[in-house]
Amino acid sequence: MAARKPGLIALFDVDGTLTAPRKEVTPEMLKFMKELRKVVTVGVVGGSDLVKISEQLGKTVTTDYDYCFSENGLVAHKDGKLIGTQSLKSFLGDEKLKEFINFTLHYIADLDIPIKRGTFIEFRSGMLNVSPIGRNCSQEERDEFEKYDKVHKIRQTMVSVLREKFAHLNLTFSIGGQISFDVFPQGWDKTYCLRYLEEFNEIHFFGDKTYKGGNDHEIYESERTAGHTVTSPEDTVKQCSDLFLGKDNGSS
């Protein structure tokens, strides 16, 4: 077996890269990642919290990979141990948070959209997730809202209003998924995790939303990474096989 290459890490987005969108990882992908880890250091970085990432990648996610970065790296694990945390609450303070949440809830209350459900704001340790329809809508309602939003630009308009109103807080607004958008301080995108990877001089990042506005864009564009756009978990396997495993290393 080839020794692991020092100074090199393969870093993966979760949703759409290691798993199909919002689905669990396949046994085939887990097996492939285990093989890959024999030749390179491997890390995962997802925008979701550790609970949601564990639902997709499995409960042993923090030990299955050398690095596990949840909430874009605001919660960081190395070799199964917590090595760093940052929180929105300690960064902004309760007064500013309350001001933002109150305004947002008033805005949603006045929104005239076909249906509303519940959980309009989800408070995570590193970000707020805002959903005009409410996160506990059904999959069917989620699909319908996505279509409605494409025409009526509900989220885009709301983000414009919030961006202007709270310009003094230096927040980033990232529209993703079907029904919501994320709100976090500038610089708290996936590049945040790179501060834990100073020992690596070659960082290969793999993600599917690498276009401008996508939540993989900043880390893909970073001068510290070699960015790779993937179209599916199968494409991830193919690109990594070509890059790291080669023909003579394909079996163990």
UniProtKB/Swiss-Prot annotation:
Primary location recorded for the protein, binned into one broad class: cytoplasm
Cofactor: Mg(2+)
Binding site for Mg(2+) 1: 13, 15, 208
Alphabetized Pfam families for the sequence: PMM (PF03332)
GO MF term list: metal ion binding; phosphomannomutase activity
Catalytic reaction annotation: alpha-D-mannose 1-phosphate = D-mannose 6-phosphate
Enzyme class: isomerase
Residue sites binding Mg(2+) 2 per the record: 220, 225
Tagged with keyword Cytoplasm: yes
GO biological process: GDP-mannose biosynthetic process; mannose metabolic process; protein N-linked glycosylation
EC number: 5.4.2.8
Classification via InterPro entries: HAD-like_sf, HAD-SF_hydro_IIB, HAD_sf, PMM, PMM_cap
Compartment(s): Cytoplasm
Catalytic residue list: 13, 15
Alphabetical UniProt keywords: Cytoplasm, Isomerase, Magnesium, Metal-binding
Cellular component GO terms, alphabetical: cytosol
Functional pathway: Nucleotide-sugar biosynthesis; GDP-alpha-D-mannose biosynthesis; alpha-D-mannose 1-phosphate from D-fructose 6-phosphate: step 2/2
The protein's role, per its UniProt record: Catalyzes the interconversion of mannose-6-phosphate to mannose-1-phosphate, the precursor for the synthesis of GDP-mannose. GDP-mannose is an essential sugar nucleotide for the synthesis of D-mannose-containing cell wall polysaccharides (galactomannans and glucomannans), glycolipids, glycoproteins and the antioxidant L-ascorbate.
Protein family according to the UniProt entry: Belongs to the eukaryotic PMM family.
Subunit structure: Homodimer.
Protein name stated in the entry: Phosphomannomutase
Taxonomic classification: Eukaryota, Viridiplantae, Streptophyta, Embryophyta, Tracheophyta
